[in-house]
Amino acid sequence: IQSIVQVAKNFGGVEHRIEFVREIDGVKWYNDSIATSPTRVIAGLNSFNQKLIVIAGGYDKKIPFEPLAEPVNKNVKILILLGATADKIEKAVTESPLYPESGLKIVRVKTLEEAVLTAQKMAEKGDVVTLSPACTSFDLYPNFEARGRHFKRLVNEL
C-alpha cells in the first residue's frame, strides 16, 4: 500500500491530457492537446471549478460542434479560435440560447503563437488557460503530440 501511495503522490499525469505546463503571474497554463473531440473537451472543462480561457480549433474532420455549446457558454470566459473549424465552433457556441447571457468573449487568431500571446494579454491573475482544441491538428501539425509540444514551448518562452 505504501508504494501505491508513493506513486499517487508522484504521478505527474499523462502528457497532453490536462497537463499542467506552468504558472506565470498567477495564471495557470494547461496542455490538453489530446482533446481532439467535443466530448474530450467537455471532460476537460469539467476538471476545473472556474471559467477558463480556452484555445480551440483545428482540422475539420466533419464532426458536429453543437455538443460544445452549453459547456463552453457555462465554463469558458474567453474562447480563442484558430484553424479550419473556427467558424463552425463559433457558430455552434453563439447559436446557443445560453450565449447572450454567458459573458463569453470570442477571439479569432491565425496561429498558435498568436493564440498564446492573446491568452497571455487577456488573462488575469487566478485565470486558467488551456489548449483544448476539439479537433485534430492535421491542418497545422502532423499530430496532437507535435501541437502539444509546440504549445508547451510557446508557454515556456513567455
Task: Enumerate the language-model features and the residues they cover.
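Phosphate-binding loop of NTP-binding sites
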Residues: 121, 150-158
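Glycine- and other small-residue-rich loops at beta-strand/loop junctions that grip anionic moieties
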Residues: 32-33, 57-58, 82, 107, ...
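Nucleotide phosphate-binding/pyrophosphate-handling subdomain across enzymes
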Residues: 1-76
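Short glycine-rich, flexible loops that bind phosphorylated cofactors or substrates
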Residues: 88, 135-139
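Short beta-strands and strand-loop turn motifs
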Residues: 130-134
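Short, solvent-exposed loop/turn segments at secondary-structure boundaries
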Residues: 141-144
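C-terminal helical cap/extension that packs against the catalytic core
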Residues: 68-126
